[in-house]
Amino acid sequence: MYQSACQAATTGSCVPGTGQQPDNERQSALIAQQPPTAPVEPDYSGFDIVKATQYGAIARVRELVESGWDVNQPDSETVTLLHWAAINNRRDIIRYFLEKGATVDAVGGELNATPLHWATRQGHLGAVVLLMAAGADPRIRDAEGCSCIHIAAQFAHTALVAYFIAKGVDPDLQDRGGMTALMWAAWKVCALDPVRLLLTLGANPAMVDYTHGNTALHWAILARNATAISTLVLKSKASLDVPNLRGETPLSMLESQTGAIWIGAKVMDRVKEAALTSQQRRSLLSKLRHDKRLRWWSMVACPFTAFYLAGIVFTVNTLYIIKFFLLGCLYSIFHTIGKALFDEHLMALLPLSVYLATKAWFYVTWLMYIDDAVSFTATVCFLISSLLLWVCFLKSWKGDPGIIRPTREQRFKTIIELSERGGIGFEPASFCSGCLVRRPIRSKHCSVCDRCVARFDHHCPWVGNCIGLKNHSYFMGFLWMLLIMCAWMLYGGSKYYVNQCNVRFDDFLGAMRAIGNCDAWVGWVMGNALLHMSWVILLTICQTYQVICLGMTTNERMNRGRYRHFQAKGGHSPFTRGPIQNLVDFLECSCFGLVQPKRVDWMNYYDYDAQTHQTIEKEPLLSVDCPDGMAGDHQYV
C-alpha cells in the first residue's frame, strides 16, 4: 500500500511524457531548432478524489469537496483522504482538509496507522509539522505497536526524530515490545545518526526491551552495526555488563567476535580492558597496559626522558659511530614502549608533551650553563619572554577557543524553528547534527574535540586545543614568544661556547667539532632550539599573512572553494578590510582613535550579505543561503 501510495510523489509528474528520443543527431538538431512551446496543463478533470489527492491536484480536490464529498469518508481499506495527502506530502491539500474538519488522528490502513504515521514513514517533515500543529498525537501506536518516533528511527529520518523530541516526546518512549527509538536506530540504521542525535538529546542506553531484555548495544551487536557500537561504547559509555534474558552481555557477545574486521580497534581495546579479571588488574604489566591515567603520565614523561638520554649520549666521550648506535637503540626502546602502551588518543598528546619537555630543558640549560656566560640583562629578557610565552600558551591550551554551548532548550528551539521553516536548515552546511546547533558563519565542528568552535582556525596538537575566536590572538602571541625564546637560546648558547670554550663560529665545521669536544649538551639544546625555530618561523609567517593580508582563517584558506561567500569573491575573503584594519579587527583594539575595530559577534553571526557587507540574519538558525560548511574533520599545523 505504501509503495503504491507514494507512486504519484516519486514519478515527479502525473502525466507521463509521450515524446520519443530522436534516432540520430540530425533529428536532434531539427527538434532543437523548433520554437519552444508553452507547457501543457495536465487535465485532472477525470481524477477521483483519492487520485487527485495523491497527485496534488488541489483544484480538483476543491471541486469535489465543494460538491459534497466528505473529507472524513474512508475508502474500502479505512484509509482517509488525509492519509493520502500526508504520505505524498501534499501540504496545501493537508491544510485544506484540516480546514474542512478532517480528523487529524484518524486510524486506517493495514497497520491501523494515523496520517502522522504515514507521513513519518516517508520522512515528510513538512507534512508532520502541519499535522502536529493541528493536534496530531505522535504517541499513538499502530498495529505493530510503534509510535511515530520509533518509525522515524527505523527509517533514519533524523530530522523527524529530533522534531518529535523537541515537541515533547520522551526519547525513551517504548513501543509495545519495549523497544526504544535508540534500540531501533541501533538495529536498523548503519549511519551515525539518529543514534548520536538520540544520545545527545538524552536517550538512555541502559534501557532494555520486554521481549529479549536487550539494550541498544545488544541490538547494535546483533546487527553488526559498527557505527552504532562505536558510538554507544565510546561516546555514551554504554555498559558492557548488562545481561539480556539469555544471560548474554555485550561484553560476551563482542568477545565471541574477537578479530572480526567490522569491530573497530578502539571498541576492542575497551572490550579487552573490561574483560580483565581482578587478579590481572593487579599485575604491573596489566596496569601499565590498561591503566589510562598511568599510561597518560607515561606518555607525558617519555619526551622528557628521551630528550635527556639523547643529550647524555651526545656528551659521552666515545666514537661518533657508537653514539649513533646508542641513539638507534634508544629510539628502538622508546618505539617499542610506545607501541605497547600508547593508543591513538595518547599519541595525540605527543606534540604537546614534546613542547613541554623541550621548554623545560631549555630552562635547566640556561640556569646551569648559560646564565654565567651572559649578562644579567640577557637573562632578564629571556625570563620575560618566557613569562609572556607561558601566559599565551596557557590561554591557548586551557582557554575557551569559542565553543558554542547550547542549552537543551536552545537546541529544541533550533530544531523546531528549522522544522517549521520547511527543514531547509538541516543540511550539514548549516546544521551540526553532533552538537545540534546552527552553525554560525566561519565556525566548524572539530572532530578531535567533538565540538563546534566559532571562527575556527585549526586544531593545534602543539597546544592540545582548537584555535578559534577567543584564543586565536593568544596563539599568535604564543608563536611570536616561542620564536623569541628559541632565538634567545641560540644567542645564549653561542655566548656560552665563545666564553667557555673559545669556539669561533666563522668556521662552521671547526665550531661543530669544538662544541662536541667541549660540552655537547648545550649544542644538543641549541639544535633543538634551531629545529623548533624553523617550523615556528614558517607557521608564524603563514598565520600572520593570513590574518593581516588575507583576512581569513586557516580553515577558510584550505576550504574556501566550499564556502559560497568565498566563491562569490573569487576565492578572496569577504571579511578583509585591508592589512591595517585586519590587524586592528583581529586584536580588537583601537590605535589612538585613528582606526577602530569592527566588533563582530562571531558566536551569533549567521549569514553574510556580499553586497552590503552586513549580517542579514542574527537569529539562532541558518537560512537556506548559508555558506557551505567543510566536510573534513580538522587541520593540524
Swiss-Prot record:
- The stretches that face the Lumenal side, renumbered to this chain, are 316-318, 367-373, 494-520
Cytoplasmic compartment residues: 1-295, 342-345, 395-472, 542-637
| Reported consequences of knocking out the gene | RNAi-mediated knockdown causes reduced basal secretion of Sog.
Give the bilayer topology.
Answer: Multi-pass membrane protein
Keywords assigned by UniProt? Answer: Acyltransferase, ANK repeat, Cell membrane, Cell projection, Golgi apparatus, Lipoprotein, Membrane, Palmitate, Repeat, Synapse, Transferase, Transmembrane, Transmembrane helix
- Superkingdom is Eukaryota
Q: Which reaction does it catalyse?
A: L-cysteinyl-[protein] + hexadecanoyl-CoA = S-hexadecanoyl-L-cysteinyl-[protein] + CoA
| The keyword Zinc-finger belongs to this UniProt entry's keyword annotation | no
* EC number(s) stated in the UniProt entry for this protein: 2.3.1.225
Q: What tissue specificity does the UniProt entry give?
A: In stage 13-15 embryos, expressed in the central nervous system. At the third instar larval stage, expressed in the ventral nerve cord and is enriched in the neuropil.
Q: Which SMART domains match?
A: ANK (SM00248)
Report the transmembrane regions from the record. Answer: 296-315, 319-341, 346-366, 374-394, 473-493, 521-541
Give residue ranges for domain DHHC: 430-480
Quaternary data:
Interacts with dorsal-ventral patterning protein Sog.
Q: Which family does it belong to?
A: Belongs to the DHHC palmitoyltransferase family. AKR/ZDHHC17 subfamily.
Concerning PANTHER family, the annotation shows:
ANK_REP_REGION DOMAIN-CONTAINING PROTEIN-RELATED (PTHR24161), PALMITOYLTRANSFERASE HIP14 (PTHR24161:SF85)
Q: What is known of its domains?
A: The DHHC domain is required for palmitoyltransferase activity.
Role noted for this protein: Probable palmitoyltransferase which is required for photoreceptor synaptic transmission and for the correct expression and localization of palmitoylated protein Csp and synaptosomal-associated protein Snap25. Probably palmitoylates Csp. Probably also palmitoylates the dorsal-ventral patterning protein Sog and promotes its secretion and activity and the stabilization of the membrane-bound form. Required for synaptic vesicle exocytosis.
Protein name according to UniProt = Palmitoyltransferase Hip14
User: According to the entry, what is the taxonomic lineage of the organism?
Assistant: Eukaryota, Metazoa, Ecdysozoa, Arthropoda, Hexapoda
